[in-house]
């Protein structure tokens, strides 16, 4: 096992700990690509890495090919064998390697959105949870999967009034059971989205089609009906 020098520093793991576990530390990423048959990393290769990839070299990482035509063509040209974390499925169709990333993304979405509702960042000066005498923010979450569920929980926990939409009635029933009273569920269709975005202060897009690009649920025409300063995450 080869590990690039300082690869674990950001996560709190020193080179010495990797060496103690039996790994060999290599000075540069080029050294790792040159020696290893399989590359394991967190994010997709960047352009500087493309020339380092050898034919039939196995890469195991998050790729998100659907969102990057350049990366897709680069991996084809390099004749790499690519295993994408985000498409690894259990027999239940669950995506075990995508779930942790989705949990983080969902929890961060309301935080990031709330930031851009603040006046210092040219927002409308809205507090998600409101204060005495002031209404809380209206938050719309599109998609009731892992990201959407976590986003709705955090926004609701901060006191916002949350609407979460999904195309699965079974999922909406589950969410109805587990969410607090300031979260309402609604079936997702064009009409309901069109009406909900008119009053939303913060909109979180959380729709997933495994291995494919997420659909565009909000059109340019719909954007014109939003309140000025509405934040989309």
Predicted regions mapped to residue ranges:
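Structural alpha-helical scaffold elements that stabilize or flank donor/cofactor-binding regions
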Residues: 31-32, 52, 196-197, 222-225
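An N-terminal-biased, well-structured beta-alpha scaffold segment characteristic
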Residues: 1-74, 78
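Rossmann-like NAD(P)-binding element
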Residues: 30-47, 180-217, 231
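Glycine-rich phosphate/diphosphate-binding loop of Rossmann-like nucleotide-binding domains
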Residues: 1-13, 122-208
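Residue-level detector of alpha-helix initiation sites
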Residues: 44, 104, 145-147
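Helical hairpin unit composed of two closely spaced alpha helices linked by a short loop
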Residues: 220-233
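Glycine/serine-rich phosphate-binding loop and adjoining beta1-alpha1 elements at the start
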Residues: 47-138
């Amino acid at each position: 096992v080869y590990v690039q020098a300082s690869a674990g520093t950001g996560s709190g793991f020193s080179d010495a700990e990797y060496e103690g576990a039996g790994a060999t530390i290599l000075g540069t990423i080029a050294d790792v690509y040159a020696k290893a048959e399989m590359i394991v990393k967190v994010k997709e290769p960047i352009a500087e890495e493309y020339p380092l990839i050898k034919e039939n070299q196995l890469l195991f990482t998050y790729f998100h090919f659907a969102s990057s035509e350049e990366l897709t063509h680069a991996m084809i040209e390099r004749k790499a064998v690519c295993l994408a974390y985000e498409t690894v499925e259990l027999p239940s169709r669950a995506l075990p390697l995508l779930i942790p990333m989705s949990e983080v993304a969902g929890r961060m979405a309301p935080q990031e959105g709330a930031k851009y509702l603040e006046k210092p960042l040219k927002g409308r000066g809205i507090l998600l949870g409101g204060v005495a005498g002031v209404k809380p923010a209206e938050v719309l979450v599109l998609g009731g999967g892992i990201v959407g569920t976590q986003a709705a929980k955090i926004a609701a926990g901060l006191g916002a009034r949350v609407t979460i939409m999904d195309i699965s009635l079974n999922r909406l029933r589950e969410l109805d059971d587990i969410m607090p009273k300031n979260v309402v569920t609604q079936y997702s269709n064009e009409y309901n989205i069109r009406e909900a975005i008119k009053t939303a202060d913060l909109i979180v897009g959380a729709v997933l089609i495994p291995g494919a690009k997420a659909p565009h649920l909000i059109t340019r025409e719909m954007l014109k009906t939003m309140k000025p300063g509405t934040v989309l995450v």
